[in-house]
Amino acid sequence: MKNMAKKTNTRPKRRQRKNIDSGVAHIRSTFNNTIVTITDPHGNAISWASAGALGFKGSRKSTPFAAQMAAESAAKTAMEHGMKTIEVSVKGPGAGREAAIRSLQAVGLEVNMIKDVTPVPHNGCRPPKRRRV
């Protein structure tokens, strides 16, 4: 009975509060969803949110309002880590691009630069056929 296993206190580690004053907001806006990731200048993720993760399902994920809520949620978490200024890089053709940028400004983050990093093919893959509704 002497070599019984020692009971250890293994509690999940609490996320440390980083002091980062500037960062980059990556907004990926597709036709189906909007994903907002806020990183430090080196690209390490600090917070993220998406329309689907906030409870929007189906076609509601692709609305500007869902993108606004996702950007707000990610920005509030980033501001808890001390973020004040932000550069925005937007990718994709979705409806939530402008709404996400506006809500980042409305929450209180100062937007220094907005750049569009949507990939444009040099005539690569064949695009999907036109929809007939």
Swiss-Prot record:
PROSITE patterns membership: RIBOSOMAL_S11
Pfam family name, one: Ribosomal_S11
InterPro entries to which the protein is assigned, alphabetical: Ribosomal_uS11 (IPR001971), Ribosomal_uS11_bac-type (IPR019981), Ribosomal_uS11_CS (IPR018102), Ribosomal_uS11_sf (IPR036967)
A Gene Ontology BP annotation from the UniProt entry: translation
Record keywords, A-Z: Ribonucleoprotein, Ribosomal protein, RNA-binding, rRNA-binding
Listed GO CC annotations: ribonucleoprotein complex; ribosome
Top-level taxon of the source organism: Bacteria
Molecular function (Gene Ontology), one example: structural constituent of ribosome
Keyword Ribonucleoprotein: yes
Family the UniProt entry places it in: Belongs to the universal ribosomal protein uS11 family.
Subunit details: Part of the 30S ribosomal subunit. Interacts with proteins S7 and S18. Binds to IF-3.
Function: Located on the platform of the 30S subunit, it bridges several disparate RNA helices of the 16S rRNA. Forms part of the Shine-Dalgarno cleft in the 70S ribosome.
NCBIfam families (alphabetical): PRK05309.1, uS11_bact
Alphabetical list of PANTHER family matching this protein: 40S RIBOSOMAL PROTEIN S14/30S RIBOSOMAL PROTEIN S11
Protein name: Small ribosomal subunit protein uS11
Classification of source organism: Bacteria, Bacillati, Bacillota, Bacilli, Bacillales
Gene expressing this chain: rpsK
